[in-house]
């Protein structure tokens, strides 16, 4: 059965996905995931399991790809809010913002290690391709 699977910390269960052809993992946008990034990337590399994350750093460090908000853009937008607050605006009067700039990073080194090919048309959509 395909779909979500609960996290299981036992070593033999870590590679359960690797035995299921066509499976992969999507990392949640969560501080725990970021803090355990090294162990997660090591586990998926050893198990040859594709991983997609919302964090650019994951793709740089070895996941298959990342797609998520552009962190630099978020920090720039946050700085403008800090500036407005320091100039006297009340934080409660500022509108809520959501990310509006997203980036796709594809790691071809990982793709090759996993034996996966990625279409050129998809690579053309990427903001960054790691070769």
Regions found by a protein language model. Give the residues of each.
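Short hydrophobic alpha-helices and adjacent helix-cap/hinge residues
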Residues: 1-131
